[in-house]
Amino acid sequence: MAVSKLPVRSCLIDGEAIVCDENGLAVYELICRHDAGERAVLSAFDLLEPDGKDLRRRPIEKRKELLAQLLNGRKSISFFGEDGEIVFREACKLGCEGIVSKRLGSIYRSGRSPLWLKVKNPNAPTVKREAEEDWGR
């Protein structure tokens, strides 16, 4: 769905442009290719400001609910309320780069927050490459 098709005049969404491989996994190297634009999609994480209404102080659960309504059932990022360790193990089995865990009830803050935790899959190709590059420095 094109952003211009959303039922708002303006909107601030936290998300990431991704390109998926044939298995449906986001692959960093694919977004870097010159022809990525045709295959790139926005993976929306959070709704911050629809039509000028600042939602950043609202709890994450409410922002996710409003994001789902805005996208009207269209695919976005997956949200789970289950135990983070279980979700992480399953994400690793699928070959995902990792997960971001956000504490229920948290408000939106730019930058890093102790209420939001990014956990990387040590076996994901992108993470292995990052580790190798860091080791060489």
Give residue ranges: language-model regions.
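Catalytic cores of nucleic-acid ligases and guanylyltransferases
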Residues: M1-R137
